[in-house]
């Protein structure tokens, strides 16, 4: 198995679903791995968990959206799956 390609595929999937509520199981299923093995491989190759990656990317995108100044904080929070602004 090409682990780098598998993790890149998972990252592409996560990037495409930043505004969706996705789970570790969803991502693992996409790359045909168990949740345990996916999280372990992702953590080894990226030095962060999939949840940390999603949280950082969502926060980064939310910040960029807010910097544009055209969206309300509550709208951006809900867009990126935050429960409250």
Residue ranges and their predicted role:
Residues 36, 85:
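Key DNA-contact positions within bacterial/archaeal DNA-binding proteins
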Residues 8-25, 44-80:
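Terminal helix-turn-helix DNA-binding modules in bacterial transcription factors
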């Amino acid at each position: 198995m090409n682990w780098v390609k598998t993790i890149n595929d998972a990252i592409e999937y996560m990037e495409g679903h930043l505004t969706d509520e996705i789970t570790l199981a969803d991502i693992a299923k996409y790359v045909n791995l168990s949740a345990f093995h996916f999280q372990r491989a992702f953590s080894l190759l990226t030095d962060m968990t999939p949840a940390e990656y999603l949280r950082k990317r969502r926060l980064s995108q939310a910040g960029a959206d807010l910097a544009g100044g055209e969206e309300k904080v509550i709208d951006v929070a809900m867009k990126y799956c935050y429960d409250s602004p």
